[in-house]
Amino acid sequence: MQARYSVSSPNSLGVVPYLSGEQSYYRAAAAAAAAGGGYTGMAAPMSMYSHPAHEQYQAGMARAYGPYTPQPQPKDMVKPPYSYIALITMAIQNAPDKKITLNGIYQFIMERFPFYRDNKQGWQNSIRHNLSLNECFVKVPRDDKKPGKGSYWTLDPDSYNMFENGSFLRRRRRFKKKDVSKDATKEDKERLLKEHHGSQSAAAQQQRQQQQSQAQAEQDSNSQPVRIQDIKTENGTSSPPQSMSPALSAVPKIESPDSSSSMSSGSPHSIPSNRSMSLEAAESHHPHHQQHSQGFSVDNIMTSLRGSPQGSAELPSPLISSSRTGIAPSLSLSYSPGQGSIYSSPCSQGTSSGGGAGTYHCNMQAMSLYSGDRSGHLTPANTPAATTVEETLPDYSISTTSAQSHGNQEHPHQGRLPSWYLNQTGELGHLAGATYPGQQQNFHSVREMFESQRLALNSSPVNGNSSCQMSFPPSQSLYRTSGAFVYDCSKF
């Protein structure tokens, strides 16, 4: 609303005339307008449409805005379109040595741009701020030849191309000084890290390979089959391989003897063992006795029990009396060589150096089974020469042999026998001679014959060299396969 007041009128300077009590602000304004003619053009828009527009516009505007001539502002007072970085760069480049002090920068800017001649405190602070924050400006200390206040400022050699095409109006990018030392340290750190990681990876790979090799070795050791020969028994001797026949696995094992009983036997070739042995294993342990078969008899039991007082206490009274009088009855079954390996597992170890090939001595429990299976009329023998009956089977022959021929040649297997084993030997250990004539008698008649045989042995004079052997030809099988005999447990 500067058009209200005419420039030529003294009232246009904003001087309000004195207002008395009767005069109001609006009257004074109207008087000032009448004096200067400021409000004469207000009626022009009302009469604008009744007259030609061009003439009415010229008449109204000539009176309203004609006398107003605004004071023109000089071009030097306009702020230049350059940034403070560009102004500082101009000042440094215009210097003769390409370096200038802070005061020289101020003087250059004020001489070139009159806009910065006023308000010096504001823009000079901005100049100092840009000098310290931008890396493109480098501070050079003043030398002694040119004493003065302040240091020189110059441009970094890499910052001359930071403006596009030499124009200070536009900058390409913010300049960042390259720190060579920092780059070198970064490269060294990266190289060291790579080497460290490489060494760690090599060590880890080597450790993994060692672990894999150890695991594979453990698997190989676990997968190897354990040989039976490598298993040590209670007395430190290697155990023999067992027979794989399922029918022979039910035979009870013979317990290993004590060290005292084994030492008291006096036999240098006695081998203590707590497992059953086959003929092949016995031959491998005794290579100098390979022509002879194994033997187990009551003689071996008696010799082992003589060295063990505890075992002699467990014997029944008939066996104790016979051992005191020097009787060594041996019930031995002699087999042919063709059938020796079949019945090898139920019998225990004992080598014979003087007996012929094919003799095999079985334990007393097997004899009790044979007696129940092949029951018949038993003839008691009160004399050393056994008497035969007319109904005797032709395949079974009974012969009395001298215990002296076996006592010097056999290597007894010493072992303390349990009570269930000795109870069987109590009934069968005193048979001096017996025949098995027929197989038509039942078990009760066989038991009566055994009782009469035992009573006859106790009452008859004792011959210390008598023993009983039964020889089986190879044509006769030990176990009957015809099924004629039925084993009934209710009879017992």
From Swiss-Prot:
Induction: By vegt, acting via nodal signaling.
Pfam families in the cross-refs: Forkhead (PF00250)
PROSITE patterns to which the protein is assigned, alphabetical: FORK_HEAD_1, FORK_HEAD_2, FORK_HEAD_3
Alphabetical list of SMART domains matching this protein: FH (SM00339)
Domain of life from the UniProt record: Eukaryota
Deletion phenotype: Embryos gastrulate and neurulate, but at the tailbud stage show stunted growth and loss of cells at the blastopore. Embryos continue to develop but display shortened axes and abnormal gut and heart development by the swimming tadpole stage.
Gene3D superfamilies xref list: Winged helix-like DNA-binding domain superfamily/Winged helix DNA-binding domain
Biased composition (Basic and acidic residues): 178-198
InterPro entries: Fork_head_dom (IPR001766), FOX_domain-containing (IPR050211), FOXC1/C2-like_FH (IPR047391), TF_fork_head_CS_1 (IPR018122), TF_fork_head_CS_2 (IPR030456), WH-like_DNA-bd_sf (IPR036388), WH_DNA-bd_sf (IPR036390)
Region of interest (Disordered), ranges: 175-323
A single GO cellular-component term on record: nucleus
Subunit structure: Monomer.
Function: DNA-binding transcriptional factor that plays a role in a broad range of cellular and developmental processes such as eye, bones, cardiovascular, kidney and skin development. Acts either as a transcriptional activator or repressor. Binds to the consensus binding site 5'-[G/C][A/T]AAA[T/C]AA[A/C]-3' in promoter of target genes. Upon DNA-binding, promotes DNA bending. Required for cell viability and resistance to oxidative stress in the eye. Promotes cell growth inhibition by stopping the cell cycle in the G1 phase through TGFB1-mediated signals.
Name the UniProt record assigns to this protein: Forkhead box protein C1-A
